[in-house]
């Protein structure tokens, strides 16, 4: 019976190792970073055919850089002198801000879309990652025309 008690008794080293492993797992679980963070600025109401600016700020909490393509998708056609698609390198220390100027004469729903893509000659030394989990992010806003 004494031998069984000796086998199942936890030594201080075993308890300490278990504590360190548990703390390591807890720290790893809390260390989740958001891939893409979108912030859009658009007035909620405008008058018909008024020039409107949509501002999109894109950030990441990942340590690696990514090549992104940002564009708009709308429920109705938009008119205006703007570039529909932007491509750039997004890094944690360098958030990107994109602007679109457009006009509309009716209420419209606009989706700002950011795709993470594989493209060369965008990020420095072509050092960029493409996440496995998801590569398309979007934010939907409504613009009411009076």
Swiss-Prot record:
GO terms for molecular function: aspartic-type endopeptidase activity; identical protein binding; IgG binding. GO terms for biological process: detection of chemical stimulus involved in sensory perception of bitter taste; negative regulation of T cell apoptotic process; positive regulation of gene expression; proteolysis; regulation of immune system process. Keywords: Disulfide bond, Glycoprotein, Pyrrolidone carboxylic acid, Secreted, Signal. One of its GO terms (cellular component) is extracellular space. InterPro entries: Ig-like_fold (IPR013783), Ig_E-set (IPR014756), PIP (IPR007990). Residues 1-28 form the signal peptide. It holds the Pfam family SVA. Coiled coil: none annotated. The modification Pyrrolidone carboxylic acid is found at residue 29. Disulfide bonds join 65-91, 89-123. It is found in: Secreted. Glycans are attached at residue 105. PANTHER family: PROLACTIN-INDUCIBLE PROTEIN, PROLACTIN-INDUCIBLE PROTEIN/SEMINAL VESICLE ANTIGEN. Belongs to the PIP family. Monomer. Interacts with AZGP1. This is Prolactin-inducible protein homolog. It comes from Cavia porcellus. The gene is PIP.
């Amino acid at each position: 019976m004494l031998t069984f008690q000796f086998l199942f008794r936890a030594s201080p080293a075993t308890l300490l190792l278990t504590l360190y492993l548990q703390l390591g797992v807890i720290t790893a679980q809390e260390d989740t970073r958001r891939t893409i963070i979108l912030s859009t600025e658009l007035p909620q109401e405008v008058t018909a055919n008024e020039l409107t600016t949509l501002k999109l700020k894109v950030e990441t909490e990942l340590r690696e850089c990514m090549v992104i393509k940002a564009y708009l998708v709308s429920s109705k056609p938009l008119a205006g002198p703007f570039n529909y698609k932007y491509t750039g390198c997004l890094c944690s220390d360098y958030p990107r801000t994109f602007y679109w100027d457009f006009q509309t004469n009716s209420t419209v729903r606009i989706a700002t879309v950011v795709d993470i893509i594989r493209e060369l000659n965008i990020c420095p030394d072509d050092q960029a990652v493409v996440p496995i989990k998801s590569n398309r992010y979007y934010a939907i806003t409504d613009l009411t025309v009076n």
